[in-house]
Swiss-Prot record:
Organism, scientific name: Neorickettsia sennetsu (strain ATCC VR-367 / Miyayama)
Binding residues for tRNA: 19, 69, 71, 117
Pfam families tied to this protein: Pept_tRNA_hydro (PF01195)
Subunit structure: Monomer.
Record-given protein name: Peptidyl-tRNA hydrolase
UniProt-listed Enzyme Commission number(s): 3.1.1.29
Amino acid sequence: MSEFRTFVLCGLGNPGLRYAQTRHNLGFMLIDYVRYTFSFPEFLPKFSGLLSSGRVSSFLLYLFKPVAFMNNSGRPLVQLVNFYKVELENVIVFHDDIDLDFAKVKIKRGGGSGGHNGLKSLDFNLGRDYWRFRFGVGRGVGDPAEHVLSRFTALELERLNKLFGFIGTNLPLLLSDIATRKEKFLNEYKCCSQ
């Protein structure tokens, strides 16, 4: 019997319809996409969040959306990580980033919060040694807080769907890269996005 490597994929966002489809909820949107794409079961309430799990390739995945507001995302995630005894090197957090141009992505392990309140909460509760998958939403014009709480335009949603499609198709490659410290996923993404 083969052994599955376990990963937690956590999307950051705020609960409620008021925040649905906003830039700050991009992490929730991606987790929803992965659940749907890989036919994982419906989310169930657990650890002050919504949890689903399933297998993709040789990986067991826990998909998680903390339903505490963004500023308190760390507590629910640390409960899940401790309960399932998942190493931080196997935790990937998907979140918006105003310092990246729209639809640009960066992946790194560790680092600072960059002023992102969800990451501040994770760093405080969990430590910093998890993977961060940063999605660019740009700065917009005016107040950054208003920008991240604004909804995506139809054109932006179309571009996000293409990006999510790429991530869904290449999720096993992303997980394998993280497991083996290679960068095939990022190289594939760079080729695809040019």
